[in-house]
Structure formats: C-alpha cells, structure tokens
Amino acid sequence: MHDNIFLPDAFLAQVQETMPSHLSMDEFVAACKRPLRRSIRVNTLKNSVEEFKKRAEEKQWQLDPVPWCDTGFWITRQESDTVKLGSTAEHMAGLFYIQEASSMMPVTALLKDNDNIEMALDMASAPGSKTTQLAAGMKNKGALVANEYSSSRVKILCSNVQRCGVSNVALTHFDGRVFGGWLPETFDSILLDAPCSGEGTIRKDPDAMHNWSPESVIEIGDTQRDLIKSAFHALKPGGVMVYSTCTLNHEENQNICHHLVTEFGDAVTFEPLGDLFENAEKALTKEGFLHIYPQIFDSEGFFVAKIRKNSATIAPEVKKRLGKFPFALANQKEIKAIEDELHNTLQLSIPETNELWIRDKEVWAFPKRMSSLIGEMRYHRIGFKLAETHKKGYRWQHEAIMAIAKADNPTSSELTIEQAREWYMGRDVRPDNVGKGETIVTFNGAVIGLGKWVGNRIKNGLPRELVRDGNLF
C-alpha cells in the first residue's frame, strides 16, 4: 500500500469534477494507493502464447489474462524477490515484454479491424512497448516508423526493438510536429501515445504528481494539439489513428480530440471503442473514447481514442534539408554472395519482406515497404544490421540473429543454465559437445546470441552493451 502517495488537492478537485457520477472518489483514492499489478505481453515474434504458457507453468508463474490484449497477462512469481522479472532468461531472450496492462490498449484499438497495415507510424515510441506490440501485430510485415524525440530514450528503444526480434522498423529522432509537413498523407495507421502530465501513473510512481500543476496541464495541452494535428496530416485519407495518454484530465484527452474536429471538421470521425473488449463500456465516454480510471479495471489510468480520416487535408509546406542517403541498394552479385554465405554458415535466409542495403562495409536488411520513404527524411536506423564485411567474408551481427534465427537451427548449440549465465556475463562457454565455425547459441529452446567455436569452447559474441551481471535467472 502506497500510504505516502502525493495527491494534490487541486488534482483531486479536478477528478471530482470530471469523473462520471457512478464512480466513487473514495474508490479512486484507494485504487491510487494500491501497488500496480505486474503485467507482461508475450512477444509473438518469438513464441506463441501457448508456448509461453507452457514455459510459465514449468516455472510456476501464475498468468491471469488481460481482457483487452490476447497476448497480455498479469504475472505472479514466487521468485520475484530474488530474481527481477527483467533478469529472467525469458525476458532477456525477448520472449516477453514487461508492459503495464493499460498501455496495451492503444495498439489493440489500432489493430482492431485493421489487419493489413502497410505503413504505420508510432510518433512517440520510447521505450518501445507499443512499437514492439504493433510490430508483432503486423507480423514484422509492412513498415513501421518509430519516432522518439528524446535522445536519451532512443538507445533503450533501439535495444528493445533488437531484443524482441523486430525487423520491419525504421527509427527516427525528431519532434513529432515535423511529420505532418514532411510526410503528408503517408501512413495508413498512426499511434500517438502523447507526452502528458502522467496523472494515471500514480500507482507505479508515488512521486508522479510532485511536479503537477493546473498550469502544467494547460502547457502540455498546447504540445498535444500540435502533435495530433501533425499526425492527422501524416495520415492517409481512409486511415486510422489512435490518440492515447496515461493521464486523466479532459484538457489533455477529450479536448485534444475535439480540437481536431475544430480544425478539420467532417474529415474527422471518432470510432467508438465500446466493443473493444468485454466490459469496455464501463470506461466509455459519450464520444466513444475509453477514459480509464484506475479503479475500473484495477490498472493505471489511461485514455484511448480512435480516429478515422475521411478526406484529404492541406498539409503545411516545408522545406526539407536532407543530406545524401549513405546507403546503396545491393546489386545482384552482392546479394547472391551474402545470401550464399549466410546459408552456408548458419543455414539462414533473408526474410522475404526485407532487402539488402550497403554502407561502406556494413550490410543492412531494410523493410521493403520503406523504399518509398528513402530520401524523404533522416533515419536513426532502418531494419537491422545483418553483417560487416571483412577479408574472409562476412561477420554476422547479434541483432540479425535475434531477428531471423530459430532455436531449431541445425547450427545451434544449447547451453545449460550455468553456461547461459556465463554467456550473459560476456564469458566464453564450454558445452559438452564440440562443433566448428559459427553457431547460434540457445538456452531453454530460445535464441540468445551468436558464437564461434574455437577448439572446445564457444567464443562469446554478445555485444558489450548487453553484458549483464548480478542475479540472473
């Protein structure tokens, strides 16, 4: 129980004024003081829900389904005091993502009746929970531009994308307000999980409200209006976008959506979310939005709106200043050489949805659907780095193995739990069997990296930034 939680009087007065009359303030405050239930989302790019359930049963993890996400679960573990959830082998291998249950709802809303996404934008994407959820929903097909304005958060976004085996993402690092002018009417699906005052995160962070003020709410609302206008300009006619926040006031939620109607009139339609999941109507507003107070579903506070663009809009004119794109599409000779060696050394192939691009000695696999956006803006990275060339061929990259390799690969080497711990600490390992050449390293039936046989040991190929210590699984 978070008895020392800080709830400003002005905040409570605001909630009292706007919360539906059938909800109780006493229950709201009591819910805010209860610790948040831990929740995860199974990464179906790496394993199915049924496969993960079997793993969980073997480890005596209790999984309770999240009603609005068929891959989401609240999790209870006996060993939670000794091994952190993020230090479990399953998490480190990308089999699941630690994600608050409410934050799974925006992507669920975006994917509903929207199975064939070709070009998507996640406008404010770090740390990557919704980006990886959307990529899994797209089955790594099409193209997903994941943008993050904060430079300090781009690194963790990149790390999570790689851990989860995402291959259809291009990362960008811009103020989201540029997209409407730079890429007008480009995306068929857009997620704007907007920066907000964070009123719904109290259960996770008891100090979340210490910097809150009515003035700060108004100030951040100005940014949100700019972002939602930019997103709407970037959306194709007929496309859908989801606007979401983890806050509770109307200024940052309903009012932002209504501002879009003020700006664009009949081009805007709000799509009702009352049938998104069982009992969704408990959080439904008159417009069809979901306004989730923490006591309704025993979760974080959240807001979700689904918006369809009915007709074209006139985007702002901008002048782009872009340097020369540093990559060149690989020619047929290069493609054959790379594909042949990849197959001969690791029995792997390039996904059909990706194509090879080369920059100096680097070989990258870009999503094919990104080709129309090459040269339209600058990218932090696109797709995944497959290899680096050297005098004896190609040096395959860890992130490529995490994206395309499976544990049943003929070249794989399965480690014991002791060896797997050594591996994650950056040390070479000595399995009982002996092989030769490069090998895909696995533990408990999941890919964890790439190594190379040197005598009777496997030389560790884990990137330095992924080396861990402490109490691992």
From Swiss-Prot:
GO molecular function: RNA binding; rRNA (cytosine-C5-)-methyltransferase activity
Gene3D superfamilies: 3.10.450.720, Vaccinia Virus protein VP39
Enzyme class: transferase
Record GO biological process: rRNA base methylation
Listed InterPro entries: Methyltr_RsmF_N, MeTrfase_RsmB-F_NOP2_cat, MeTrfase_RsmB-F_NOP2_dom, Nol1_Nop2_Fmu_2, Nop2p, RCMT, rRNA_ssu_MeTfrase_F, SAM-dependent_MTases_sf
Residues reported to bind S-adenosyl-L-methionine: A124, S125, A126, P127, G128, S129, K130, E148, D175, D193
One term under GO cellular component: cytoplasm
Assigned keywords, A-Z: Cytoplasm, Methyltransferase, RNA-binding, rRNA processing, S-adenosyl-L-methionine, Transferase
Pfam family, one: Methyltr_RsmF_N
UniProt subcellular location: Cytoplasm
Residues annotated as catalytic: C246
Enzyme Commission number(s) of this protein: 2.1.1.178
Catalytic activity annotation: cytidine(1407) in 16S rRNA + S-adenosyl-L-methionine = 5-methylcytidine(1407) in 16S rRNA + S-adenosyl-L-homocysteine + H(+)
Membership in a protein family: Belongs to the class I-like SAM-binding methyltransferase superfamily. RsmB/NOP family.
Function: Specifically methylates the cytosine at position 1407 (m5C1407) of 16S rRNA.
Name of the protein: Ribosomal RNA small subunit methyltransferase F
Protein species of origin: Aliivibrio salmonicida (strain LFI1238) (Vibrio salmonicida (strain LFI1238))
The organism's taxonomic lineage, starting at the top: Bacteria, Pseudomonadati, Pseudomonadota, Gammaproteobacteria, Vibrionales
